[in-house]
Amino acid sequence: MRSFISILFSIFFSNLIAQSITQNPLSYFGIGEQNFGSNAIYDALGRNSVNYYDSSQLNIFNPASYSSMSSGNTLLTIGLNGRLSKFSELNNDALRITIMPDQFALGFKLSKQIGAAFGLKPYSRRGYDITEYDSINLLINKYEGSGGTQAFFLGAGFRIFKLNTSNLSFGFNANYIFGSVTNTRNSKLFSTINSTPAGISNSTIKLNAINIDLGISFEQIISKNHSVILTGAFTPNLLSQNLKISEGLFYANSSSAGVIYDTINYNVVSSSINNSALKFGLSYRINLKSWQRNMRFINPSILFLGSYSTMKTNFSTSSNEMNQISFGIQFAPETKIFENNINLKLLEKINYRIGFYKQQNSINAISNLNYNDLGFTFGLGIPIIIQQSLSSFNASFSFGNCNAKNSSSLSEKYFGINFGFVFSPAKFDRWFRKRKLD
């Protein structure tokens, strides 16, 4: 098990530090493409990330959830996702495949009322490859974007109070953000046979920053079979930041030693970015009546989720605002898996998930760009019950269409797949257990 986890971590880390981990031309703007958080569990539920958690999973997007982890169980979560996109603009189409890491996080209980977690997750990413034929200036321009920023986080969740029917929790994540993104343009004349660019201009943004995520959760048990959870998460503007923009312009100078690029202009300036996010969520759980199947009883439940998220980014000459609504449903044929594991069939152990989301993305740069992203999702959660371990394998699939209001602008149709693993030691093999020696 531990060697398998090491292999997954190596795959995750190698993808995280890769130069290009997205293929979206809109990542040209700002510090790259950002989102509200990705995970195989939450993506399958229509991207509901702030309002779903239990003792068998680690929700790093709402740190208040850390207090709900079960005592004595350590949770390690790793995620990877892929995306097949078809971009269209006027009469031009292009297919792109992207593989991106989700997160690498470890969570554990410090006491009955306090849980903690730390890990690594993407913050922004840039990646595109566009060729332009300029017939007026007789130039071939190739635009490329690469790089990404990551966030290392350390957080804790506290149960403020717990009554017979009520539970209030609060949590925070402290994040250290680091990394860089680059825009590059290579230019050469139509008449040039040599593939070496005659001129190169690039702009690199390097960011080191600190910020904090705040989360809150209130659970109310209405009756034996009904409960509701209200959640919220807020990320204020960066508390501290060091942002540098390096811009250079170079031209090719041929010599006997080969092509040498001379610097025409190079400049480094300091800048700043404002980035904040807010999420609200609600979940409603209903424990259904027990079903009898072939002299066996199973205890099903259904969970309804809805959330609203907004993110605002202001940077240099561009700004971006994203708003998203999400809906999801999860059906669990059996809620008492550990107690009835021996009598359950495989399909009765799986959690079934479906969802829908709509995201509006407004980019104000050289011109105003307004995109609507609509998608449908579904997925499965398969518990790995070995000696009462909380481990599980989760998968989600999404179909979406991202269009601008202007029909001649760039559009995207995509299919996404997301895999996530939650690892937890078996009951007899605690990773952080105090041992006594006789």
Predicted regions and their residues:
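Bacterial Sec-dependent N-terminal signal peptides
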Residues: M1-Q23, F118
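Subset of outer-membrane beta-barrel
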Residues: Q19-D438
